[in-house]
Amino acid sequence: MNTQQLAKLRTIVPEMRRVRHIHFVGIGGAGMGGIAEVLANEGYQISGSDLAPNPVTQQLSALGATIYFHHRPENVLDASVVVVSTAISADNPELVAAREARIPVIRRAEMLAELMRFRHGIAVAGTHGKTTTTAMVSSIYAEAGLDPTFVNGGLVKAAGTHARLGSSRYLIAEADESDASFLHLQPMVAIVTNIEADHMETYQGDFENLKQTFINFLHNLPFYGRAVMCVDDPVVRELLPRVGRHITTYGFSDDADVRIESYRQVGPQGHFTLSRQDKPLMTVTLNAPGRHNALNAAAAVAVATEEGIDDADILRALAGFQGTGRRFDFLGEFPLEPVNGKSGSAMLVDDYGHHPTEVDATLKAARAGWPDKRLVMVFQPHRYTRTRDLYDDFANVLSQVDVLLMLDVYSAGETAIPGADSRSLCRTIRSRGKLDPILVSDADTVPETLAQLLQADDLVLVQGAGNVGKVARKLAELKLQPQKKEEEHHGR
């Protein structure tokens, strides 16, 4: 952003008083890094710490941020404020030093709320679909020339970044319910895609508590704001009478205000019509597969229609939508001859979905778009508690693939729970007689194991939220070819 654009922005969004240097503890996370990127572009001095470099820290370094790959007290001593992610423990030396120095320590969502405070905020909440819906809304507003600021939990591929500072009053942000921190936000428009039992440790294991928290979030809207809610989701539908704000519903349901009709999928694209109250029928080509993405698009269209964005801009944005990182992310199609000597090729897709509902949506999209392909999944369960709580659901959905390679559970810092591990899950799936899962304890051996199994026209889905994305990128880099053993490499 140039000086003239920043000056224009300052007429809308004033600077934070007495804040010059902002330090982020855990800056490499997508949500943290996105906020840091926006603030860096606004002209604030940014520093942060994390355990290892990644694309987020590299991007921030390129913007002039100071990044430390260690946590030390001296990192924070010049800071005006310290921003922390929920992954950071209370005894972190930087947090301890900040408190001793009486430097304000705030959560990520509080800083996001500050960014939103003087803007027209659009917050996207829900158990599934937040990242893609946020990207779709951002793409439509950008196509319409509204130059929004956006802060997303995943890479917006068209922009090549998780976040971007725009010069207008619009801020589009993913709202995180995992730690209930979305209650800090006070948007003008709020989308709720769906509500399922996830992150229940935050809500004391009480689903009613989770539902009430979503109600409280929606009541952060001003009385003239608008809630955009997916009426297909039974929990969202149940909550409608309790929401004391203007509501637009969307979905496949007959009573939806924005209704999806005549959906069909051809390869990676969805084709459908949208009926809207007092508006012409909209014929949509969506460059994203699956009925779940049609729902995400309907939410984005509902918001854009309410804002008065021209239908032509909406349709262009959806037809040209480039997707988000690790959401049915097509990494290539590779010939099998150098992999295992077979003819034909195999497709490689990377997907972040780690809840049974998300995995099921990915599988349905794959089956609908490529009905003749064999589905080969490399799956990494995420968290022992989630595996335990949704054990039967995981067993059911994973039994739908044709070939299953399962990595060990990505613990995310949790202690192992007996019976909620990958070996147990493989055993349960095997006992159902539909397929024989392969437990892969060493992720480095995935290319070699896959090479023995792959056939022409396979679709390989690398699925999960832990570090399995690195496996997907490695497979793409290797073009699915197994790595040569050291002795072969040296000609022994």
From Swiss-Prot:
Molecular function, one GO term: ATP binding
Pathway the protein acts in: Cell wall biogenesis; peptidoglycan biosynthesis
One GO-annotated biological process of the protein: cell division
Recorded catalytic activity of this chain's protein: UDP-N-acetyl-alpha-D-muramate + L-alanine + ATP = UDP-N-acetyl-alpha-D-muramoyl-L-alanine + ADP + phosphate + H(+)
Binding positions (ATP): G126, T127, H128, G129, K130, T131, T132
Subcellular location: Cytoplasm
Pfam family, one: Mur_ligase_M
Keyword field contains Cytoplasm: yes
Cellular component, GO annotation: cytoplasm
Family, as annotated: Belongs to the MurCDEF family.
Protein name as catalogued: UDP-N-acetylmuramate--L-alanine ligase
Species assigned in the record: Serratia proteamaculans (strain 568)
The encoding gene: murC
